[in-house]
Amino acid sequence: MLGAIIGDIAGSKYEFNNTFDYDFEMFGEGCDFTDDTICTVAIADAILNGRSYQESLLDWCRRYPSPKGAYGGRFAGWIRSLNPQPYNSFGNGSAMRVSPVAWLFDDLSQVLEEAEKTALPTHNHPEGIKGAKAVAHAIWHFRKSRFSEESKECKDKNSKESDDKAMKAFKDIARSYYEDFDTRDYPKGRFDETCMDAVPLSFYLLSQASSFEDAIRLAISHGGDSDTIGAIVGSIAEARFGIPQDMKEKAISYLPDDMKDVLKQFAENAK
């Protein structure tokens, strides 16, 4: 989940002021965590402490009512409501907050079931649910590819062969959710907050990356909804590449103590 947080913080200052410079300042003045981080922490907290996803999302978002970049209009109304109900959203919010599920559950069927549950309080449209499941599936795939005994043996023999095999399987996953993954256009700078755009775009950017930092730089410099694209790409890149220690430490320095506590608990319980 820290990959999502890093992508969110790195992209936060560029969400409404896009950069197309690959060498942008990663953690510069004006960067901060946004709703993407708050909601990701909320999902982790729910799983770790036996809370419902809705209860945890409401708690954390009410605890931090005015994050950098603000909450989306309908989501903000949902937070303030005395009787919050799902509003059939297919926005990218379901995809950006789902990453803890892929680390805290081990069986794919359970990962996908829980991913759907994380979307339902707000993003109960089929595309909102699909976006959450697709991202969780991708993270789970790379987590298993990196840490399985078979993968370790294969990497010892031929690292490139192992990586190529994992990437081929990832692209198959992408196509299983988005049939036109290989043929659609991914123009720079298009601001589209739907799962139908953000998730395949994030998969495409991840497929071009050679390291965690490269993935984040490709995501942010593509423009558009920079913090959320950064969060989705970062969440998958963490599972594929791991995260450099200096980037971990820098991102954590932006977080308040209650979020750090959840991160610590998450690290102790991740599969």
PLM regions and their residue ranges:
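Structured, active/binding-site neighborhoods that engage oxygen-rich ligands
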Residues: 1-271
